[in-house]
Amino acid sequence: MYISRNLEQWNAFLQMLKIAFEENKAQEFLTLLLTADERDAVGLRLQIVSQLIDKNMPQREIQQNLNTSAATITRGSNMIKTMDPDFMQWMKQHLDLIEKN
């Protein structure tokens, strides 16, 4: 699994993110820290992961559908390979629920 270059800062971010969600401030917190382009990139990464998990289409088709680079799709695919299978099943379950709504 990927380990942040500065684990202390990453953990501080995760703690603040948790607090922001608990206090219903996640939108403001992430808007403060992420530019519009970064928020779009996170959304794109989520779409990539969702489509890669489904395994219904080749990476090239995902690339064309999402209008992104092959390298971006490959980064998502490579990260999935490093993740615990139980976590990826959890992701799929929740992504499926989101897509149904």
Curated annotation (Swiss-Prot):
Major location category of this protein: cytoplasm
DNA-binding region coordinates: 59-82
Pfam families listed in its UniProt record: Trp_repressor (PF01371)
One GO term describing the cellular component: cytoplasm
GO molecular function: DNA-binding transcription factor activity; sequence-specific DNA binding
Gene Ontology biological process: negative regulation of DNA-templated transcription; regulation of DNA-templated transcription
Matches recorded under InterPro entries: Trp_repress, Trp_repress_bac, Trp_repressor/repl_initiator, TrpR-like_sf
Keywords: Cytoplasm, DNA-binding, Repressor, Transcription, Transcription regulation
Subcellular location(s) of the protein: Cytoplasm
Top-level taxon of origin: Bacteria
Subunit structure: Homodimer.
Family: Belongs to the TrpR family.
Role description: This protein is an aporepressor. When complexed with L-tryptophan it binds the operator region of the trp operon and prevents the initiation of transcription.
Alphabetical list of PANTHER family matching this protein: TRP OPERON REPRESSOR
Name this polypeptide is given: Trp operon repressor homolog
Protein source organism: Haemophilus influenzae (strain ATCC 51907 / DSM 11121 / KW20 / Rd)
